[in-house]
Swiss-Prot record:
Binding site for Zn(2+) 1: C66, C68, C81, C84
Gene name for this UniProt entry: rpoC
Quaternary organization: The RNAP catalytic core consists of 2 alpha, 1 beta, 1 beta' and 1 omega subunit. When a sigma factor is associated with the core the holoenzyme is formed, which can initiate transcription.
Lineage: Bacteria, Pseudomonadati, Bacteroidota, Bacteroidia, Bacteroidales
Function: DNA-dependent RNA polymerase catalyzes the transcription of DNA into RNA using the four ribonucleoside triphosphates as substrates.
Gene Ontology annotations of biological process type: DNA-templated transcription
SUPFAM superfamilies associated with the record: beta and beta-prime subunits of DNA dependent RNA-polymerase
Protein origin, superkingdom: Bacteria
Catalytic activity: RNA(n) + a ribonucleoside 5'-triphosphate = RNA(n+1) + diphosphate
Organism per entry: Phocaeicola vulgatus (strain ATCC 8482 / DSM 1447 / JCM 5826 / CCUG 4940 / NBRC 14291 / NCTC 11154) (Bacteroides vulgatus)
Cofactor note: Binds 1 Mg(2+) ion per subunit. Binds 2 Zn(2+) ions per subunit.
GO cellular component: DNA-directed RNA polymerase complex
Name of the protein this chain belongs to: DNA-directed RNA polymerase subunit beta'
Record's keyword terms, sorted: DNA-directed RNA polymerase, Magnesium, Metal-binding, Nucleotidyltransferase, Transcription, Transferase, Zinc
Binding positions for Mg(2+) per the UniProt entry: D472, D474, D476
Required cofactor names: Mg(2+); Zn(2+)
Length: 1428
């Protein structure tokens, strides 16, 4: 028995490597062999000797006490008992010491032949089926054909029992007695033993050479891919030279994990609870021992083979029970948990124990509001504090000499004697606590507070801290943690104190914004009322105004004039006569710092956020906190003074409601009449009805809003709550006193988009709903609650993936020195600005110098931060776009650099080295994800679609410019002549008549009617174009007669007739017969073809066969999907889809080149579209005929233009327009989803995630590098490898050289030396060629793929697919350098960010004297050297 070495791992390691375990290593780490399946003796409850819990192998069960009891107590430490062989030591060694089981026959490791990719199979070139047949003793495999090679038997051939016996019969007699090494001997075996022989005889270098040759020269793509797959496995073994041998994938010795990690616990009633692993180990041992016996008694081969197979299966179950088809089950039919299962999943070792540990010194309780707390304080119940600070109190008790021993001090604390409260007060000063509310969605979910002792049992929380925690006081609970060490206390105070975290890291806006009551109070006090008492008085200063108010001479809302301090235009504080203000506003301004000026506005939640922002900028965080406490107190006080509750009478129903509803009903009747007469289709009727009610509803809302706003000069309580932003939304008020409106229809699960019920709910909540109305609306309410529950999980999972992909992005250097950047412009949608240039460049770093275009003044130098003032200056200048540094173009090798990241939004200063920007980005994106999903049910399933806007109207006086416009002339319903647009790419630009600046650009849809011409100068409000919002149309461009082709009833079209109207409609359906393609030809009178139009699936044909049509007539209407109620339920999956870089379900076909369109033939239900560029390059695309084709013959398209309807896939954008375009696309698309919900998140967070998605490249041509074709490698690694071979030479012919072989890569210098030596001896010199670098293509990975592809295997394994990741890592002999957060948390190290940065580890802080002494010495040395 090989004895183990003492291996104590130091905790200051800097990397972890993983590899296959060799049998020698397993023995080295083992403390002895487990020979018996027994666990413990049923009578004595002591472990059996040589069993699974044996004390001799694993160590004693009790501290310092051997099995037989001969040696007890610590003084015998280290002695091995002579009677029972147990070493006397502490019992915790039973958590560390391993044992082993020596198997009689080798078995294959299930990870390497059962999981895909099949490693052993790839190495040997055997398919999984055949490999299974060998491993499970069903077939023999030929290991060495020997003399049988002539009979056509080759290595790796599989033989059945009969074939094997036949061969043995025909073998020459002496063949069996030859040595195994003799090449003539025939050898065939079965089981893992055979695999072992095959693997150990592999020549990896030769195999690698052969496969490389195959991969580069094979004509068949399939064989080429096969070769590349095998090559990857071969290369992994070659790369981890010596550390991994292929034959180690076959297990000869099974390690047994320490007994404490698979415990056996006695329950009451004489039964035991045991870990599943013990069962699995027991089966292995029993089968192994039985096999030993069978071999000893020379049992027949059949029996042995069966037993060997059972042993293989037992070991399989032990390693990975979930992978087997017939998993081992318990009596209760539950599969046993194997070693792999204990690592996997949420309950596995990684996520349960290594990444989520429980913490001592913690408490939890319900929270209540603490309105009199200051910022950064919280109230902790007395009893809780005494328990939390116990060790500190004990220490103080002993220090003060009140007690002598710790034990008696404990008693005093437990009895809560009065003396401890005084000590507790003292101990708590300057010792903050951390408060945490679950779910902790972002870093503000844990903050530090200075505790105050309070009576009661609930924790008091500062009301302004609620937003960050997303807490309310309806029974939420919070956990308290106590930082113990001095470092921890310091970090809590400096970095985590609530008063220091008043900005939201997601967008830089203040997060400590008063809400609800406070806002209402401030709004009320700053509101003006005409005709109030004391109106028009003038006061010489705030004091006088307050005296007048207190004496009751002037009302708090009265409009008065006061002399106050305000800022002049240079920003100096001066006295100003403020007209039109009120006493309330004076009171508020007493709290506002003078540096901000005088606020003479009404305060709502929105304006309050800006005010707080300004205060922080003007006077810094410390004084901003005082200001916040001031307005908190004032707000609460005024909400109470104003008595701002509302009653039923405050909910006003506008008189106009009846009129509007009547109008709506009349319009709907008219629509029904049109339908019954057959003027419109059922679909159009439905759309128009929905449209009518949507309009009625929005008109009613406007009137209602005006009514309530004018009630009591706007002092209506309901209106004040709404207008101040304290509570409620326009939607809710509309439902209370307008009408509930349209509701969504109950939908089957998985159906796309909600339909809308066309009968609206005309009542509101004040009038009360009828039974039917109530029933309709319950659906929405319930759906909301169900969605919430389901979506929370999705949002949480999104956050987890985001963190996993970006946790290693840390600011690692000041400046990476890149010259690249992103061009940033204001984001516009048509002509409304979504994000201004100011917002997008603020806090970023400029790439180049920015100079004012007219004055030539330098605004900001390259490499400098764009501050608020600079951004404003750029915004005001005519500059349209700015090139800024971005993490997308950062060239740091690890993490990103400070200049590319820009400003840290949580502190408004440039980001510091060591900031964990990746995790912050992930939290900023994930946190609102949960919020968004929780926001569905408030509208109660109300159909939230706006009335379709289907026209272009001039918003200013401007000149029109059309581009790519193709039209035909026709007449509209009124018989007026109009032009109809028939080009797909038409755009109209509105140009300012005076300056020539483009005001806005609009896309003019196909089928629009034009009411203006190119170059017209139009007035504001003029209609330019309008189109049918409900139907996409196909319009004929030629005049002639219709001729249908392949339009066959019930094959390519179906007829829908309407019972109500008796109207028949032809609707094109998808045909089973792909040769039949429905189309409409336009022919002349004499039958010559002019144009052909395809009829897309789902189109309603509105012309008859043989009908005469003129240019501009509609042939087909394709109903647009309308009435889809938008919900973030669509939003969250969209975000996931973008971050996972998934292709949409119906992708558009996109042109890859600029060129002209020609329509080709129809092939198998696809229409061929040919794009020919000006250079003569031709690309052909096949578009499914069920799709609508967006281009027409002779159109000129740009690269990236969609040819058919559908979404463009990110992969297409990357391939056609390049990486920058796809990065911008993903960032903007995700931003759109969040913007729709009114969530502001800074672009840089999305950029970090997208950067992580674009880390990898795929090798196209490996050249002379070590890469393989199609291999996916890190961009950084790729560049380094190319740099490595740059300028080197590859030997083509080694000539007479002894040192160099063909194919070897050498430096030019080595080559020169070698050749000059050969020349001197008149020998043939070496011939070389230049080394060829690899080429690659940038790829876009989804966040899951990117997280699994990280360089750290520990991070990947703790994320998903644990076994697969570890499996790959082991074969590659990977080394984890512990650069990210997760790896370090798993190892129990400080994270390499913030105060845990690695360079801080080596810093030694000495005393001031020492420093002075060193300086003095240095000065002496310098002086001395000068003298010399």
């Amino acid at each position: 028995m090989a004895f183990r070495k003492e291996t104590k791992i130091k905790s200051n390691f800097s990397k972890i490597s993983i590899g296959l375990a060799s049998p020698e290593e397993i023995l080295e780490n083992s403390s002895g062999e487990v020979l018996k399946p027994e666990t413990i003796n049923y009578r004595t409850y002591k472990p059996e000797r040589d069993g699974l819990f044996c004390e001799r192998i694993f160590g004693p069960v009790k501290d310092y006490e051997c099995h037989c009891g001969k040696y007890k107590r610590i003084r015998y430490k280290g002695i091995v008992c002579d009677r029972c062989g147990v070493e006397v030591t502490e019992k915790k060694v039973r958590r560390e010491r391993m044992g082993h089981i020596q198997l009689v026959v080798p078995v294959a490791h299930i990870w390497y032949f059962r999981s895909l990719p099949n490693k052993i199979g790839y190495l040997l070139g055997l398919p999984t089926k055949k490999l299974d047949a060998i491993v499970y003793y069903e077939r023999y495999v030929v290991i060495q054909p020997g003399v049988k090679a002539e009979d056509g038997i080759n290595k790796y051939d599989l033989l059945s029992e009969e074939e094997y016996l036949d061969i043995l019969d025909t073998l020459p007699k002496e063949n069996q007695y030859l040595e195994d090494t003799d090449p003539n001997k025939f050898i065939a075996k079965m089981g893992a033993e055979a695999i072992y022989d095959l693997l150990s005889t592999l020549d990896l270098d030769a195999l690698s050479y052969e496969l490389r040759h195959k991969a580069s020269n094979d004509s068949s793509q399939q064989r080429k891919n096969e070769a590349l797959k095998r090559l990857q496995v071969v290369e992994s073994f070659r790369a981890s030279r010596g550390r991994n041998k292929p034959e180690w994938m076959i297990v000869r010795i099974v390690p047994v994990i320490p007994p404490e990690l698979r415990p056996l616990v006695p329950l009451d009633g004489g039964r035991f609870a045991t870990s599943d692993l013990n069962d699995l180990y027991r089966r292995v041992i029993i089968r192994n021992n039985r096999l030993k016996r069978l071999i000893e008694i020379k049992a027949p081969e059949v029996i042995l083979r069966n037993e060997k197979r059972m042993l293989q299966e037992a070991v399989d179950s032990l390693f990975d029970n979930s992978r087997k088809s017939s998993a081992v089950k318990t009596d209760a039919n539950r599969p046993l948990k194997s070693l792999s299962d204990s690592l996997k999943g949420k309950q596995g070792r990684f996520r349960q124990n290594l990444l989520g540990k429980r913490v001592d010194y913690s408490a939890r309780s319900v929270i209540v509001v603490g309105p009199e707390l200051k910022m950064g304080e919280c109230g902790i119940p007395k009893l809780m504090a005494a328990e939390l600070y116990k060790p500190f109190i004990i220490r103080k008790l002993i220090e003060r000499g009140i007690v002598k021993t710790v034990k008696s001090a404990k008693k005093i604390v437990d009895r809560k004697e009065p003396v401890i409260w005084d000590i507790l007060e003292h101990v708590m000063k300057g010792h903050p606590v951390l408060l945490n509310r679950a779910p902790t969605l972002h870093r503000l979910g844990i903050q530090a507070f200075q505790p105050h002792m309070i009576e009661g049992k609930a924790i008091q929380l500062h009301p302004l801290a609620c937003t960050a925690f997303n807490a309310d006081f309806d029974g939420d609970q919070m956990a308290v943690h106590l930082p113990l060490s001095n470092d921890a206390i310091l970090e809590a105070q400096m970095l985590m104190l609530q008063a220091h975290n008043i900005l939201n890291p997601a967008n830089g806006a203040p997060i400590t914004v008063p809400a609800q009551d406070m806002v209402l109070g401030l709004y009320y006090i700053t509101k003006l009322r005409k005709g109030a008492k004391g109106e028009g008085l003038t006061f010489y200063g705030p004091e006088e105004a307050l005296i007048a108010y207190n004496e009751g001479k002037v009302d708090i809302h009265a409009i008065v004039n006061v002399v106050v301090k305000d800022l002049d235009k240079d920003g100096k504080i001066v006295d100003v006569m403020m007209k039109e203000t009120s006493v309330g506003r004076v009171i508020v301004n007493e709290i506002v710092p003078a540096e901000v000026g005088y606020l003479n506005t009404i305060i709502s939640k929105k304006s309050l956020r800006d005010i707080i922002s300004d205060v922080i900028k003007a006077v810094g965080v410390a004084r901003a906190c005082e200001f916040l406490d001031g307005i908190k107190n004032l707000g609460y006080y005024m909400a109470f003074k104003g008595g701002l509750s509302f009653n039923l009478g405050d909910i006003i129903i506008p008189k106009e409601k009846e009129e509007l509803v009547k109008r709506g009903n009349e319009e709907v009747e008219q629509i029904m009449m049109n339908y019954n007469m057959g003027f419109i289709t059922d679909n159009e009727r439905y759309n128009q009805v929905i449209d009518t009610w949507t309009h009625v509803n929005s008109d009613l809302s406007d009137i209602l809003y005006k009514t309530i706003k004018n009630d009591d000069q706007g002092f209506n309580s309901v209106f004040m709550m709404l207008d101040s932003g304290a509570r409620g939304s326009k939607e809710q008020i509309r439902q209370l006193s307008g009408m509930r409106g349209l509701m969504a229809k109950p939908q089957k699960a998985g159906a796309e988009g909600a339909q809308i019920i066309e009968n609206p709910i005309l009542s509101n909540f004040k009038e009360g709903l009828s039974v039917l109305e109530y029933f309709i609306s319950t659906h929405g309410a319930r759906k909301g609650l169900a969605d919430t529950a389901l979506k929370t999980a999705d949002a949480g999972y999104l956050t987890r993936r985001l963190v996993d992909v970006s946790h290693d992005v840390i600011i690692n250097e000041e400046d990476c020195g890149t010259l690249r950047g992103l061009v940033c412009t204001a984001l516009k949608n048509n002509d409304e600005v979504i994000a201004t240039l100011y917002e997008r460049i603020l806090g970023r770093v400029s790439v180049h110098d920015i100079v004012h275009p007219t004055t030539g003044k330098l605004i900001v130098a390259g490499g400098e931060e764009i501050t608020e003032d600079i951004a404003q200056e750029i915004e005001d200048s005519p500059i349209e776009s700015v090139e800024i540094r971005s993490v997308l173009t950062c060239e740091s090798k690890k993490g990103v650099c400070a200049k590319c990241y820009g400003r840290n939004l949580a502190s408004s200063r440039m980001v510091q080295k060591g900031e964990a920007v990746g995790v912050i980005a992930a939290q900023s994106i994930g946190e609102p994800g949960t919020q968004l999903t929780l926001r569905t049910f408030h509208a109660g399933g109300i159909a939230g679609n706006m009335a379709a806007n289907a026209s272009i109207v001039a918003k200013n006086n401007a000149r029109l410019e059309f581009e790519e416009l193709r039209t035909v002339d026709t007449v509209d319903e009124m018989g007026e002549a109009v032009k109809v647009v028939v080009g797909r790419l038409a755009e109209v630009r509105f140009i300012d008549v005076n300056t020539g600046i483009i005001l806005s650009t609009h896309n003019v849809p196909y089928g629009s009617k034009l009411y203006a011409a190119d170059g017209d100068i139009v007035e504001k409000g003029k209609l330019i174009a309008k189109w049918d919002p409900f139907n996409a149309v196909i319009i004929t461009e030629a005049t002639g007669k219709i001729e249908f082709e392949s339009v066959v009833e019930n094959v390519t079209y179906k007829v829908e007739s309407d019972e109500a109207t008796g109207l028949r409609e032809i609707i094109i359906i998808e045909s089973k017969d792909k040769t039949k393609v429905p189309s409409a030809h336009i022919v002349t009178e004499d039958g010559n073809l002019i144009r052909t139009y395809n009829l897309p699936v789902g189109g309603h044909v509105v012309v008859e066969n043989g009908q005469a049509v003129k240019a501009g007539d509609i042939i087909v209407k394709i109903p647009r999907a309308v009435g889809k109620a938008g919900d973030i339920t669509g939003g969250l999956p969209r975000v996931t889809e973008l971050f996972e870089a998934r292709n949409p379900s119906n992708p558009a076909v996109v042109s890859e080149i600029d060129g002209e369109i020609t329509m080709g033939k129809i092939k198998r239900g696809n229409r061929e579209i040919i794009v020919t560029s000006k250079t003569g390059e031709v690309k052909k695309y096949l578009v499914n005929l069920s799709k609508q084709i967006l281009v027409q013959e002779n159109d000129y398209v740009r690269a990236g233009t969609p040819l058919s309807d559908g979404a463009i896939t990110p992969a297409d954008i990357l391939a056609i327009k390049g990486p920058t375009a796809v990065q911008e696309y993903i960032v903007n698309e995700v931003q759109d989803v969040y913007r729709l919900q009114g969530v502001k998140i800074n672009d840089k967070h999305f950029e970090i995630i997208v950067r992580q998605m674009m880390r990898k490249v795929e090798i196209d041509e490996p050249g002379d590098t070590r890469f393989l074709e199609q291999q996916v490698v890190d961009k950084q690694e790729f560049m380094e490898e190319n740099d490595r071979i740059w300028g080197k030479k590859v030997v083509v012919d080694s000539g007479d050289s002894q040192n160099l072989q063909p194919g070897q890569i050498v430096t030019a210098r080595k080559l020169r030396d070698e050749n000059s030596m050969l020349k001197r001896r008149d020998l043939k010199p070496v011939e070389v060629r230049d080394a060829i670098p690899a080429t690659s293509t940038q790829i876009l990975q989804g966040i899951t793929r990117a997280a699994l592809g990280t360089s750290s295997f520990m991070s990947a394994a703790s994320f998903q697919e644990t076994t697969k990741v570890l499996n790959e890592a082991a074969i590659n002999g990977k080394v984890d350098r512990l650069e990210g957060m997760k790896e370090n948390v798993i190892c129990g190290h400080l994270i390499p960010a913030g105060t845990g940065q690695r360079e801080f580890e080596k810093i030694i802080v000495g005393s001031k004297e020492e420093y002075d002494r060193i300086l003095a010495n240095r000065k002496n040395v310098l002086d001395y050297s000068e003298v010399e």
